[in-house]
A protein has these predicted regions:
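Acidic glycine/aspartate-rich repeat arrays in secreted/surface proteins
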Residues: 105-115, 174-190, 197, 203, ...
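Zinc-dependent metalloendopeptidases
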Residues: 1-264, 268-309, 362
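GD-rich hexapeptide-repeat beta-solenoids
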Residues: 44-50, 54-55, 184-206, 210, ...
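Short, surface-exposed beta-strand/loop micro-motifs that present aromatic residues
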Residues: 33-36, 182-183, 254-256, 449, ...
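Extracellular, beta-strand-rich repeat scaffolds characterized by small/acidic residue-biased motifs
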Residues: 260, 269-271, 280, 309-314, ...
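Short, ordered beta-strand-loop transition motifs
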Residues: 38-39, 104-106, 133-136, 248-249, ...
């Protein structure tokens, strides 16, 4: 009796609910069968070739319902590589692993056997024995009509396509025109190789050849979706940064499955315009000079191809939800981004580019074309950094052009819609804003930048040396490494990677050090400073607004700065000054110290330590096990509205009130004595007692440090938590 060598067991699966996918499954649950999976890994399936080593028909005897025929014989050695590749095409996309074994005299054969049989009618190429529990060891076996013996089974042949089709049956796929019928217009091999209908152009004669090519060389979009529904996806296939490059000399129908990396669909070799889409489950149409192929390059569902390159023709390229880089190259191209932060570069020609959602960047100004840029939603940028001459950009008018007649030929004349940011050239540019919040990068050269309305920002982040910029100056100013710039109606600045000097004006400014040890002075107004270097210096005058430092390093507020917010992911600390400070932590473990003044400390995430300091402070721990720490003299008044406040004490989070630095007995002079917690009991004129009293729905912590039976400090806890001794560090 013939024996399997690996799997041999069959399971079942349910319909997906998708009409396209379910058209490849039997409507009868008894025939909706698959090879049983292996725990914790891919489904292991073996295959073999009948009689390859001359073993006789004993493998038919006792084997069950294999075809009764006068002749069975094996494929040739020259045909095996193509058949192996057909099996691999399915293993590339599905979580199955095919292992080829050699049949032997002991009767060991694969789960799937492949061979020729005279029982197959000459009207058919071959057939596959349907896999089911009732079929016995014959299920999944593929028998080929003997007239195919001259075939090579290589890609671009009908035999290769037919073998992939039969292997699809062996994996459990049905025809899309039987039972659950695929929606109209999709019953052809562009969409599923389980169809009998060939797409236009699939029967192709290469110029100078008399040998026909069949251009479908992979399972297609719905085949991949269906087989992945049954077995799962192969998430190890093509996880690097792959380039899928196509050429006009070889037409093809193909679907791309790629499991990871940053990948590119490349049609740069084409001179005729192509339609390229990166949206999963859709098709691109490549244009060939000698044949018409409609929707010939598919991208499988669940597959993300990030980038696309066009050719020298007028291409239409559409992105997906990832951060795409779409390059039109030559021709009058139409580029459309998706939901991600995309980069669009039309190349030469008069291009039409739309960013879609996300913060998109349009590369412009290199070829003199008349391009159209529509940013859509998000913060979108037109970049003239590679322009060959100066540019004038007017975001109110929505135009960009060369600054003189001679320059237009180098820069072009462009149309801008929904663009909020401009990067200038290396020349003397004029950049004019809109009524909105615009961002400008003048670059090298002596630039004129007018923000007009809104809150506008000039970035010097690309400067090749330190810059000195003063927003209070109205004329041309020598910035140093970035030339003589004239800034009008600009509110915010970002420095370079060097040691800059940034000065604000009488408005509310944002000064961003970016990198380097910078000196920043905001002037009047409520200013915001971004600090990331221990060498950064912030200068503020008295009564010059209420100012904020956003810091990526541990920082102590200097004079006349009121507020501090810690940013980034590092465990850093923030310390206030003598003013009423608002100090916010980040998501890590922070130590926040208010010092003098009526401060508010907010820990955010992490296990934070909050130290209010003198005067009346408000402390908000946020998430995590926070510690509210007090020392002698750190308390406010002896009333609900004047004492220190803990806003969100949570025993569940692990919060503690730390009084270990407070001397519980100030009269004995022996040092730092610990408190004794007495619950809600009244003081008994013993120094060092700590009690909790609920007043107006608030838990009030009271301490007697001199033994007079009266509270010497109050701490208010909102929400009336039932405080116990374990909630304190005494």
């Amino acid at each position: 009796m013939t024996q399997y060598t690996s799997n041999g067991s069959v399971g079942s699966f349910a319909l997906s609910g998708d009409a396209f996918i379910d058209s490849l499954f039997s409507p009868d649950a008894a025939f909706r069968t698959k090879w049983a999976g292996q725990a914790g890994g891919s489904t292991q399936i073996s295959y073999s070739f009948v009689f390859l080593n001359g073993f006789a028909s004993k493998f038919v005897t006792g084997y069950g319902p294999e075809p009764t025929a006068t002749q069975h014989f094996g494929v040739t050695g020259a045909q095996i590589p193509g058949i192996d590749l057909a099996f691999q095409r399915w293993a590339d996309v599905a979580n199955v692993k095919f292992t080829k074994i050699t049949e032997d005299a002991a009767g060991n054969v694969g789960d799937i056997r492949v061979g020729y049989s005279s029982a197959v009618s000459p009207d058919y190429w071959g057939y596959c024995q349907w896999i089911s529990n009732g079929a016995g060891p014959a299920h999944g076996d593929i028998w080929i009509e003997p007239g195919v013996t001259t075939g090579t089974f290589q890609p671009y042949t009908y035999d290769f396509l037919a073998m992939m089709h039969e292997i699809g049956h062996a994996l459990g796929l049905d025809h899309p025109f039987e039972g659950n019928v695929i929606p109209a217009g999709y019953d052809d091999a562009r969409y599923t190789i389980m169809s009998y209908t060939q797409p236009a152009g699939n029967f192709y004669f290469k110029p100078g050849s008399t040998q026909a090519q069949y251009l479908v060389i992979t399972p297609m979009v719905y085949d991949i979706a269906a087989v992945q529904k049954i077995y799962g996806a192969n998430m190890s296939y093509h996880t690097g940064n792959d380039v899928y490059a196509f050429t006009p000399s070889q037409p093809v129908y193909q679907t791309i499955w790629d499991a990871g990396g940053t990948d590119t669909l490349d049609v740069s070799a084409f001179s005729l315009g192509c339609t390229v889409t990166l949206v999963p489950g859709t098709y691109s149409q490549l244009t060939y000079s000698d044949t018409l192929l409609d929707a010939n390059i598919g991208i499988a569902f669940g597959c993300t191809i990030e980038n696309a390159r066009g050719g020298s023709g007028a291409d239409t390229i559409t992105g997906n939800d990832a951060a795409n880089v779409l390059s039109g190259n030559g021709g009058a191209d139409t580029l459309t981004g998706g939901a991600g932060n995309d980069t669009l570069d039309g190349g030469s020609g008069d291009d039409t580019e739309a960013g879609g959602d996300g913060n998109d960047t349009f590369n412009a100004g290199t070829d003199g074309g008349k391009d159209s840029f529509d940013g859509g939603s998000g913060q979108d940028t037109v970049n003239f950094g590679k322009a060959l001459a100066a540019v004038t950009v007017d975001l109110t008018a929505g135009t960009a052009s060369g600054t003189a007649a001679g320059d237009v030929a180098k820069v072009g004349s462009d149309t801008l819609v929904s663009v909020e940011a401009v990067i200038g050239s290396a020349f003397n540019d004029t950049l004019l804003g809109s009524g909105g919040n615009d961002v400008f990068v003048g670059g090298a050269g002596n630039d004129v930048i007018d923000g007009r309305g809104g809150i506008d920002t000039v970035l010097y982040t690309s400067a090749t040396g330190p810059v000195t910029v003063n927003l209070a100056l109205t004329g041309a100013q020598n910035t140093g490494a970035a030339g003589w710039d004239t800034l009008t109606a600009v509110e915010n600045l970002s420095g370079s990677a060097f040691n800059d000097t940034l000065t604000g004006n009488s408005g509310n400014n944002v000064l961003n050090s970016y990198a380097g040890a910078d000196t920043m002075a905001g002037g009047l107004g409520n200013d915001i400073y971004a600090v990331d270097n221990a060498g950064d210096v912030v200068s503020e005058a008295n009564d010059a607004g209420r100012d904020l430092i956003v810091s990526w390093i541990s920082l102590t507020l200097g004079a006349n700065v009121e507020n501090l917010t810690l940013s980034g992911l590092a465990a850093i600390n923030g310390t206030g000054n003598e003013l009423a400070n608002l100090i916010n932590g980040n998501s890590a473990n922070n130590v926040l110290s208010g010092l003098d003044g009526n401060d508010q400390l907010q820990g955010g995430g992490g296990a934070d330590i909050l130290i209010g300091g003198a005067a009346r402070d408000v402390m908000i721990g946020g998430a995590g096990a926070d510690t509210f720490r007090f020392a002698g003299g750190d308390f406010g008044g002896l009333a609900i509205w004047t004492c220190d406040l803990i806003s969100d004490f949570s025993r569940t989070d692990g919060d503690r009130i730390d009084l270990s630095a407070v001397d519980a007995n100030s009269a004995n002079g022996s040092g730092n004595d610990a408190f004794a917690f007495i619950g809600s009991s009244a003081f008994s004129k013993v120094a060092g007692q700590l009690r909790v009293e609920v007043i107006s729905g608030l838990s009030i912590v009271q301490g007697d440090t001199n033994g007079d039976g009266l509270a010497d400090f109050w701490i208010r806890c909102n929400g009336a938590p039932a405080l116990a001794a374990g909630d304190f560090v005494l």
